[in-house]
């Protein structure tokens, strides 16, 4: 699969605009971190010892980290010398820089979602982060699979199966809280659904542009879709933080 060279300048321009928007959102979050006082406790337990809070996560600051990771990734991909390397890789149907960015934004986001839904055990949070990041990094392997059909989607399928596990943990905690009469707030519930839908959209886009959108523009279109999904992800995070704050 190849990329139309005429579309590469557009890709760099879109990345530059996206970087500016991510940066603006990140600055809003950092500026509001002082007054948006949502602290999410993290607990550490050992056998026979009650779980005790040993740290807390500032929601606004953590969300700012996610957004600024996207800002830095998109900015560096839009200027030389990395711009040319990214274009060269995309021309070969490979989007390693995108997977590096997504592995961090997706994993930190699902950890924040887990914290908002009451998952506070440090060991569980570390496992959630590792599973989410590892699932996305399998897409780096998927880029190197050229066989059409199901046999060429082994890495994608494994990544999707692994990536849904952290969200399953979140769902389990939501259901448990409903059963004990302590449901999460409407903002947290809506934010969880929105971020889950965007996570699913990222994976669907990978499958769609590989299996259904077979054209000379498929890789460039996939990159554009990823950028737009990333912007929607930032908007959803920003909305959740501001509404909870």
State where each predicted segment sits.
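Polytopic alpha-helical membrane-helix bundles and their juxtamembrane interface segments
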Residues: 2-95, 106-245
């Amino acid at each position: 699969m190849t990329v139309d060279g005429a579309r590469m300048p557009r890709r760099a321009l879109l990345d530059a605009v996206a970087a500016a928007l991510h940066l603006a959102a990140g600055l809003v979050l950092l500026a509001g971190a002082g007054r948006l006082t949502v602290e999410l406790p993290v607990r550490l337990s050992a056998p026979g010892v009650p779980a005790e809070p040993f740290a807390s996560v500032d929601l606004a600051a953590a969300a700012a980290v996610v957004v600024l990771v996207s800002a830095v990734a998109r900015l560096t991909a839009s200027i030389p010398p990395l711009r040319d390397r990214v274009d060269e890789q995309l021309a070969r149907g490979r989007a390693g820089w995108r997977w590096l960015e997504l592995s961090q934004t997706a994993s930190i986001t699902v950890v924040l979602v887990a914290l908002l839904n009451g998952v506070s055990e440090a060991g569980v949070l570390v496992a959630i982060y590792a599973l989410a990041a590892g699932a996305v990094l399998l897409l780096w392997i998927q880029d190197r699979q050229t066989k059409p059909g199901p046999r060429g989607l082994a890495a994608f399928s494994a990544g999707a199966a692994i990536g849904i596990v952290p969200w399953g943990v979140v769902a389990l905690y939501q259901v448990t809280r409903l059963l004990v009469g302590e449901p999460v707030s409407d903002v947290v519930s809506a934010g969880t659904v929105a971020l889950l839908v965007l996570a699913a959209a990222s994976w669907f886009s990978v499958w769609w542009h590989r299996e259904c959108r077979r054209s000379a523009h498929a890789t460039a279109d996939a990159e554009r879709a990823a950028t737009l999904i990333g912007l929607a992800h930032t908007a959803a995070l920003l909305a959740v933080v501001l509404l909870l704050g």
